[in-house]
Amino acid sequence: MQIMLCAISNIASGNCSEDCKYCTQSAHVKTDIQKYRRKELSQIVLEAKMAKKNEALGFCLVTAGLGLDDEKLEYVCEAAKAVQKEAPNLLLIACNGMASVEQLKELKKAGIFSYNHNLESSKEFFPQICTTHTWESRFQTNLNAKEAGLMLCCGGIYGMGESEEDRLSFRKSLQELQPFSTPINFFIANENLKLQVPRLSVDEALKIVRDTKEALPQSVVMVAGGREVVLRERQYEIFQAGAGAIVIGDYLTTKGEEPSQDIIKLKEMGFTFASECH
């Protein structure tokens, strides 16, 4: 079985104006995460080269904050061009919050392949986890990305206290968007966050993967944050459940599995890694 590996680079971290209860980058909570306005382009390129060396096909440029402004747009475009020059053949993904069709077209011109903007959860549950912007504004940004001609990467976070009905509603909204790829994150509580809920069980997490693939058979299901912590020694069962991709290395503010360990284990299990997107 061939699977897709993706890596992320947090190129602008922390001090986010939004009050998302699940996020340690929010300025509304005190955490000990690294905070910086801009990562040096040379460091981004270094991370991209390392991602490519570690068999990654996708490389995501992530910025904290509500959305794109002119300055941030220019910076992301600069980063995309720098990565393309030094680490060609990576599929570049941008994750920069709310964005207009015009802004997204500029990202596409700079070499961005796909735009990631997660709905996070259902329309009904979202007001319980964020009050500073609406679920509808997130949905609209996804429509904007499609209109701009970008491939769509849209998913969310499970295990925030949502009901099974919320999960069904969430997946129905994803069906409306029909994303190219859909990330699944499993919520891991942090003592500084307002959101404190029991961790998902392994069986429940694997069921979420199965249900997502069933709802979105044409989308690449990507298991991202929380994979190692929630699924532990059973984490590679996600592929039997329908996943076709994982995020390797570190996440936005938390450590992930060492990429080399993932690669060794996956090769031992007979997996190969996609080098192009079909």
Swiss-Prot record:
UniProt name for this protein: Biotin synthase
HAMAP family: BioB
SUPFAM superfamilies the UniProt entry points to: Radical SAM enzymes (SSF102114)
Gene3D superfamilies: Aldolase class I
A molecular-function term among this protein's GO annotations: biotin synthase activity
Gene from which this protein is expressed: bioB
Binding residue positions for [4Fe-4S] cluster: C16, C20, C23
Subunit relationships: Homodimer.
Pathway connected to this protein: Cofactor biosynthesis; biotin biosynthesis; biotin from 7,8-diaminononanoate: step 2/2
Organism name: Campylobacter jejuni (strain RM1221)
Domain Radical SAM core span(s) in chain numbering: 1-227
Organism taxonomic ancestry: Bacteria, Pseudomonadati, Campylobacterota, Epsilonproteobacteria, Campylobacterales
Role according to the record: Catalyzes the conversion of dethiobiotin (DTB) to biotin by the insertion of a sulfur atom into dethiobiotin via a radical-based mechanism.
UniProt similarity note: Belongs to the radical SAM superfamily. Biotin synthase family.
Reactions the enzyme catalyzes: (4R,5S)-dethiobiotin + (sulfur carrier)-SH + 2 reduced [2Fe-2S]-[ferredoxin] + 2 S-adenosyl-L-methionine = (sulfur carrier)-H + biotin + 2 5'-deoxyadenosine + 2 L-methionine + 2 oxidized [2Fe-2S]-[ferredoxin]
PANTHER family according to UniProt: BIOTIN SYNTHASE (PTHR22976), BIOTIN SYNTHASE, MITOCHONDRIAL (PTHR22976:SF2)
